[in-house]
Regions:
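Eukaryote-biased RCC1-like beta-propeller repeat architecture
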Residues: 1-419
Length: 421
């Protein structure tokens, strides 16, 4: 994704392939609480960014993985437990010499998927969230015994993997049923979700929160399971679900992607509309109040100037969205939102007030560039085909991907083609 929210910070990749970060605890150099977007040094061209609780990872266009932030328990995968103030490259040898195509960061662990559809994991593992068969932390990336993986998502203490055939495997902390195995037990190995009717669906993308999990299938249906205490499962009640359960409350629209925050959910439809459910404290739902929502409510499109959205991200208490034109909007907890004050020029001290509705981040704070524009594809398959600069229309980068992954992306693209200048 060109956009990712951590616990209290935000990352975005601009259409110029530059990474910007702001908020608290993102590991910039020097370690500061950046109150408005600031460029992050690192590789020249970045394609994807993933934010965790206090660390983050980025994938460069050459397939290299860089990590930064808190290092305790090894989430950076650099062989020690030390923090890094700058983005630091993980040696390619850590992945068997194969390029990385996507990464996901959890509470204190990281998962990387390579062009060979292999999974590697590092970091905290007290709940088995690394999927390596034990509960020992890993300071370096360790290969997971699960092949053919094309998408992944990290929750706080659990992980979700999607295979090329659309099946889903989960591991880690199982309390509240967030693993989807009809129990509350943990798993130390990625375990197939085999309950019907979910097993018959072909999952395209997944999202994982603190204690709940979401999956979007190829038919545009949303499945939810885990903790439902605030309505974050989009099922109209506060009950937990131990098995994937179909959510059908989005105005009849097909779902394109979903994001999990701390006890809340954001859902993006194929029409570019945004729906929100769950905990509403600090305005994280973008619905002009702080009330919880048990039934998903549509975020007023006027806040986005009626522009269709192409990406959403959810953090602990803040949210972000990108329009098809590359405009960035944020809302929720003020420390992580990246707005300037009302001082002349709009570039003064940051405004730390919470926002109850989506508010546009001035493009000048992102170097005048928009957020990298991706096609409206499932979240983990939103590859940078639409980013024309820096050779991001395919070429050698696509050639390095598994044939099945490319096929699935092209199938998704065939539903809609978006062109931008």
């Amino acid at each position: 994704m060109a956009l990712s929210c951590g616990r209290s910070f935000t990352l975005c990749v601009t259409e110029d392939a530059e990474l910007f970060a702001w908020g608290c605890g993102m590991g910039s150099d020097p370690v500061l609480h950046e109150q408005q977007p600031a460029p992050v040094g690192g590789p020249a061209s970045i394609s994807r960014a993933a934010a965790g609780a206090r660390h983050h990872a980025v994938v460069a266009e050459d397939g290299a993985l860089y990590t930064c932030g808190e290092g305790r328990s090894g989430p950076l995968g650099l062989g020690d437990g030390e923090p890094r103030r700058r983005l630091t490259r993980v040696p390619q040898a850590a992945f068997g010499g194969v390029r990385v195509v996507l990464a996901s960061c959890g509470g204190c662990h990281t998962i990387a998927v390579t062009g060979a559809a292999q999974v590697w994991a590092c970091g905290e593992n007290d709940s088995g969230q690394l999927g390596v068969g034990d509960t020992t932390h890993r300071l370096s990336f360790t290969q997971v015994a699960a092949g053919g993986i094309v998408a992944a998502a990290c929750g706080w203490n659990h992980s979700v993997l999607v295979s090329a055939d659309g099946s889903v495997r989960t591991c880690g902390w199982g309390v509240f049923g967030c693993l989807g195995h009809n129990d509350r037990q943990g798993r130390v190995l990625p375990t197939l979700l085999c309950a019907e009717p979910f097993r018959a669906s072909r999952v395209a993308s997944v999202a994982a929160g603190d204690c709940h999990t979401l999956a979007v299938d190829d038919d545009g249906a949303l499945w939810a399971w885990g903790n439902g205490a605030h309505g974050q499962l989009c099922l109209g009640d506060q009950q937990n679900r131990l098995l994937p359960t179909l959510a059908e409350a989005f105005g009849g629209s097909r779902v394109r992607a979903a994001a999990c925050g701390d006890a809340y959910t954001l859902v993006l439809t194929e029409a570019g509309e945004l729906w929100a459910a769950g905990r509403g404290a600090r305005g994280r739902l973008g619905l002009a109040d702080e009330d919880d929502r048990l039934v998903p409510a549509r975020v007023d499109p006027r806040h986005f100037a009626h522009a269709p959205l192409c990406a959403v991200a959810a953090g602990e208490c803040h949210s972000a969205a990108v329009t098809a034109g590359g405009e960035l909007y944020t809302w929720g907890r003020g420390e992580a939102l990246g707005w300037p004050s009302q001082a002349p020029g709009g570039l003064g001290h940051a405004d730390l007030a919470d926002r109850l509705v989506p508010t546009r981040v001035p493009p000048q704070l992102l170097g005048g560039a928009g957020v990298g524009r991706t096609l409206v594809l499932p979240a983990e398959l939103a590859l940078a085909f639409a980013m024309g600069t820096h050779a991001r229309l395919g070429g050698e980068w696509i050639a390095a991907l598994p044939a099945e992954l490319v096929r699935r992306v092209l199938e998704a693209c065939a539903r809609r083609v978006v062109c931008a200048s």
